[in-house]
Structure formats: structure tokens, C-alpha cells
Amino acid sequence: MKKLKILMAASECVPFAKEGGLADVVGVLPKHLARMGHDVRVVMPRYKRVDRERYGLKQLPGVLVVPMGVIGNQYCGVWEGRIPGSDVPVYFLEHEGYYDRDGLYEVNNEGFLDNDNRFVFLSKAALELPKMIGFEPDLLHAHDWHTAAIPVLVNTTYAADPYVGGKATVLSVHNMQHQGNFYEGLMDVLGIGWEHFTFLGLENNGEANLLKGGLYHATVLNTVSEGYAREMQTPEYGWGLDGVVRERAADLYGILNGVDYEDWNPEVDPYIAARYSAADLSGKKLCKRDLQRTFGLPERDDVPLFGMVSRLVKQKGVDILAEAIHRILALDVQFVMLGAGEPWTHFYFGDIKNAYPDKFNIFVGYNNPLSHQIEAGADFFLMPSAFEPCGLNQMYSLRYGTLPIVRATGGLDDSVENFDEKTLVGTGFKFWSRDAGALFDTVGWAVHTWYHRKDAMERLIANAMAKRFTWEDAAARYEDLYGRALRKRLGEKEFARRYGKG
């Protein structure tokens, strides 16, 4: 297939601005697509935290004019940079009224009241940008509700646009829970006509739902694991849009995220106490001692050490962990936790720390070096998520020989193979029911294995460390997805004429 011109629009991208896993995908996937020969450009807001000098941004001449319906034209400057370690251009939209704020989406857990206008602006600006930079994309790739208006606009207001009209669109859904549901008056800002405010359009319980519009209008859809692609079609995980997803099931694909093994590799990790490999695990024992020391726990080789790095919110399963933690700590184990989230969790697990000073400690906040140290020093890594579209820490854990204990949902189910005690096949421990009893039973199973099945532990660690989830593989699947989108948009004959049969 002929190499493509791809415009990718997103609300965040590492290293410039990050709140979740979306940023990792947008910061890494374009680099690998570019290495395959594709011309990929990224567009995102220039938030207050995006330092122009640090990233060597250069302002483009002129001003981008963005029509915002009843609001009127809005204007922004455009700055150009590069994703570090690549030649992939990133275009930053500078609009002080929308983006010169401390948070990306909220401050003090309160979402900005104009998030609807902020991200409709991002979507429209992304469609105006190609004229400014002289770049006619073959395909537009939107991510989550923040840019889900792009497929809608391409099919309506911009249908005759010489740069983006009639183009194939891909919408990646990273989390169905967040949908961009706003007051119906947003239709007048979108400027696409009220005939699209219907049950088979953007209307959702009397509001305008940007993700719903994108799900209906995108040429093809994908999410970040095959498991989550199935779950999105159920009432439990579809968050009210499962019917829409089922309607588009033939155009929905699951692509598991990759891991940046340049950053997550115990053989070269600069943050851990000692390097190690599958062939020589002696360094992992030193990492365990160092982790115990860092968290103020007794330095014991004869006890299994559990680790957890997570946002402390219900989605991540901290509610069932809170219910099970006393039973877990009644076992001869140690447990370290890194994360922040709902205020009650800080107090609750702080009390657990005081009640079990030799067994449990928590660092409230996020610390990247410490997250590496937990992955390297722990024996087991806990992820009891209510739902997990992809998840990355379980894949990091496998590389570090730290056996994941996960609830079998989404990407966790896809990437962790359950331990079989007879065949010694597997890479971790899984449970299915979302309750404290199932979590405790699985932790108990892992503890029993650690104490009484050293042969099984050795095999599990070897199995885990042999697994690979590369971005090269993920990028190849995205390339195939782009081909599917173009074939659907153009038809097989026109696709072959323009891009070849590959």
C-alpha cells in the first residue's frame, strides 16, 4: 500500500501534556507509523503547561480562523514542534481563552464549564489547519470525545472542503465512560444543523453527545483491546451507548497498545537499584530490598511483596481492595501502593498504614522513578479494575518478572494468561467476579504458589518475561485499520487505483 498522509487530532500527547493513557498512544504511535514511511502530523492544544522553549516550538506565520457557529469566528496562533526522538510534527493551537489554564480538563476535580466549546474548537481547528500548512491528509484519526466531532464535521459542514471533505475517518475510543455530553445548544456551535440532533445522531437523553456523533459518523472505529471492543457492546460497559456500538460492530476493531521497551526494561532501567534479566534474576532480589527500604518495611526475602501503582478511583477497583485489605494483610505478606485519587482513599489507606506498619505503606501522589522501582521490586502486581480498556502496568509487570494479579476485563484479560497449576502455562493470576471475595481468593492463590510452588513461580516468571507487546506490532495493525477505512470510504476499485493493492 502506498504510504499515507495522516492527520491525528487529540487532546493530549506525551511528553507535552498527559492525564491518561490516551497521551501515551498519541505520543508513541505516530513515531512508529512514521518509521513505516507514513507522513503523520499531530494537532493538539497548547496548554499552559506546554513550555515553548523547552520543546523548541516555533510559531507559524499567520492566524488560524476557526468558525464556531453562533459564537462567531475564533482565532488562534499555531506553534510547531516535534515528538521527541522523531521528525513527527506536532501543531499546537494557542488560544488563551480556552487553553491557558492550570488543568487540561478540570481544576480541583471540577470540570471546566466551557469544555464543550474548548474541544469543538479543537476539532474544527484540526480541520482548518490543513489549509494553513498545505497538507491534504488521506485520512483523519480522532481520539475520544474531545475530537469525536471531526468525523461528524467531515460528513457535514466540511463535506465539500478541498482538504478534508470526503476523507476517511478513524475514531479511537480509549474509555467509553467519558463521552462529552453537553447542553443541546452545542449544536449551534457545531453549526451542522438540528436535523442531526436525533436518536440516530448526536441526541442522547436531551443533550448533545459528541462521542455518540463520532461513533455514528466515523468510517471505522477502534478501541485499545479486543476484549474492550466486545465489552463496549454490553450495557455494563457501554455507558448508555452500547446500542450504538452494536450497530457499528462490523466496523469496530480492537488493537492492544504496545509498550515502550526503551523505557520499561529491567536490563537498562536507570531508576532501579540493580539491573537484571530473565537469565539472571539476582538483581531483582536487590530491587526488592531497595523497595522495602524505600517504603520503610522490614527487609525480608522470605515474604511475598505486592505492589500497586494506580489512580485510586472506583474504576481501578480500590473499593473492593479496601474491603479485602484486612484479610490480605492477615497473611504473611507485604504491600506497597503508589497513587492518588478520591480523597477517602487517602485517609482509608493511611489508616491501614498505621494499623500495619510492618506490612503496608502508601505514597500518595505519582512518582515515575518510584513506579519503576515498584515494578522491579515487587513479586506480584495488583490490578483489580472494574474495567480496563487496555492497561499498561500489567504489561510492564510481565517484562519485569512481577506477576500480575488482575480482574479479567478488557486489556487485562487480553494480555495476561491465567496460571494453570497442572501444565505451568500462564503469566499471572486472574479473577472474574468484581467482589472482594474473588480478589482475596486470587491473592491467596498467588501467596500459596509463592510459598509452596517454587517450581511454578520460576516457570511463571520465565513465561512472563518472554512476553512482548511491541508498538511495531500495534502500528502494523493500525496501518491495516487505515487501509480498511480507505477501502470502505473509496471502494475497492478506487482504493486500488490510488494506493495499490497492498
UniProtKB/Swiss-Prot annotation:
It holds the Pfam family Glyco_transf_5. It catalyses: [(1->4)-alpha-D-glucosyl](n) + ADP-alpha-D-glucose = [(1->4)-alpha-D-glucosyl](n+1) + ADP + H(+). It is an enzyme of class 2 (transferase). Pathway: Glycan biosynthesis; glycogen biosynthesis. Its EC number is 2.4.1.21. ADP-alpha-D-glucose binds at residue 18. GO terms for molecular function: alpha-1,4-glucan glucosyltransferase (ADP-glucose donor) activity; alpha-1,4-glucan glucosyltransferase (UDP-glucose donor) activity. GO terms for cellular component: cytosol. GO terms for biological process: glycogen biosynthetic process. Keywords: Glycogen biosynthesis, Glycosyltransferase, Transferase. It comes from the Bacteria. Belongs to the glycosyltransferase 1 family. Bacterial/plant glycogen synthase subfamily. HAMAP family: Glycogen_synth. Synthesizes alpha-1,4-glucan chains using ADP-glucose. This is Glycogen synthase 1. The gene is glgA1.
